[in-house]
């Protein structure tokens, strides 16, 4: 929750972003994705934690009760770009569990498009698994990240929010271990 607050503050007060999402925004993949890399040699998958910049954003649309956009994305760590569908509803989600619930709902809505496959659950699942919407990238803004997501990364500047509320760690020792890791 606090990461979302920081990301919104950075976007609106420092970067002067006015739209919900814009070209130039930096996003972090929040769930591994193998679908969009199939047509790119040498790119096995988009990993949870990969940070990408939006080079182009178009065709924002609502479908199945959710919002999607076509995006051209550029890796900040490697020399490649990729075209994919981004699932806009996941950008402001507070937890992976919430995204999992949204994914289940999306599955059910897509299944309604294929009543002829209702008798063959296997064929229905195979069809849905090939949907660009079911495979849309789940992402979050990447201006502020959690301590967990930052592990293994290299950063020029680090600001640690040492909030010592119930959500952070249990007990004083847990807090200091977390702070050491950060």
Regions found by a protein language model. Name each.
Residues 2-181:
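Core RecA-like ATPase module of SF1/SF2 helicases and allied nucleic-acid translocases
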